[in-house]
């Protein structure tokens, strides 16, 4: 004697098993894609801040205080990122070492903080960058 519920339960069980397997796999692949993107994004941000410091007339260096927003532009070549960064003046001179850990100046004067929009192309396989746009206020 066969049980009709058992015949229906087996396909449903298989479906649940397949769906749960899909849910487990999907976040891992998305996480890998995001990790690959961030591997190229961080050096691109550093390039933008270094370019800002080189072109600035200020004797003090600025470093990033906050990434306000960022996105990858929809172009195939090169990889292009746009980012809105908040830069703040440090107590270190421009060409000192370890600017990435240099403390910020304490005063919050008008010239101590900039909000900048950078658009930068990156060629990660040859470690080359190109600044397409830089607007600061």
UniProtKB/Swiss-Prot annotation:
CDD domains, per database record: CY
Q: In which tissues is it expressed?
A: Expression is restricted to fetal gonads and adult testis.
- Broad class of where this protein is predominantly found: secreted
Sites carrying sugar chains? 36, 111
Sorted keywords for this record are:
Antimicrobial, Disulfide bond, Glycoprotein, Protease inhibitor, Secreted, Signal, Thiol protease inhibitor
What superkingdom heads the lineage? Answer: Eukaryota
GO cellular component entries: extracellular region
Q: Where in the cell is it found?
A: Secreted
Q: Where is the signal peptide, in residue numbers? A: 1-31
Q: Which biological process terms from the Gene Ontology are attached to this UniProt entry? A: antimicrobial humoral response
Disulfide bond sites:
92-102, 116-136
What GO molecular function annotations does the UniProt record carry, in alphabetical order? cysteine-type endopeptidase inhibitor activity
Q: According to the record, what happens upon gene knockout?
A: No visible phenotype; probably due to redundancy with other family members.
Query: Hey, which family's this protein in?
Result: Belongs to the cystatin family.
Record's function text: May be involved in testis development. May play a role in hematopoietic differentiation or inflammation. Has immunomodulatory and antimicrobial functions against Francisella tularensis, a Gram-negative bacteria.
Under what name is this protein listed? Cystatin-9
Gene field = Cst9
């Amino acid at each position: 004697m066969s049980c009709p519920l058992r015949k229906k339960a087996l396909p449903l069980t298989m479906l649940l098993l397949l769906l749960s397997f899909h849910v487990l796999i999907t976040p891992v692949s998305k996480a890998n894609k995001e990790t690959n993107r961030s591997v190229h994004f961080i050096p691109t941000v550093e390039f933008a801040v270094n370019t800002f410091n080189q072109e600035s007339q200020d004797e003090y260096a600025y470093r990033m205080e906050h990434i306000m927003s960022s996105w990858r532009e929809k172009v195939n070549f090169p990889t292009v990122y746009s980012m809105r960064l908040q830069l703040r003046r440090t107590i270190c001179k421009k060409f000192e070492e370890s600017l990435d850990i240099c403390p910020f100046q304490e005063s919050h004067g008008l010239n101590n903080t900039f909000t900048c929009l950078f658009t930068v192309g990156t060629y990660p396989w040859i470690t080359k960058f190109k600044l397409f746009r830089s607007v600061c206020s």
